[in-house]
């Protein structure tokens, strides 16, 4: 009896280790990018500003990490956000705050909800950088794989 109990415990422990290892193997870090410019705004403006974003999403921890570089704006940035859900050229509300008066490079992390992650993974998020001259957004870029 004692041997079969130990054997059952060891088999259960081995199965638990296999399940845990399999779950870790499913974890994934997805890399996204965005190219920001005035022409990507639904109503383009004459800004010469440009930017790029590198964004990663860890599917296990649900952590979003970003670095956004930008320059050539008409003035200091006043706000920056991730917006969504929206297709390219469409507007949407703020999904996630990047910062107030951000400077380049703007860096940050956040934990996403399942709905936010689904919109991000579906290509329905964009980054918008605002200035006093372009309060609705001066440069914008869709976040894509």
Spell out what each predicted region is:
Residues 2-5, 12, 17, 22-80, ...:
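Metal-centered catalytic cores of metalloenzymes
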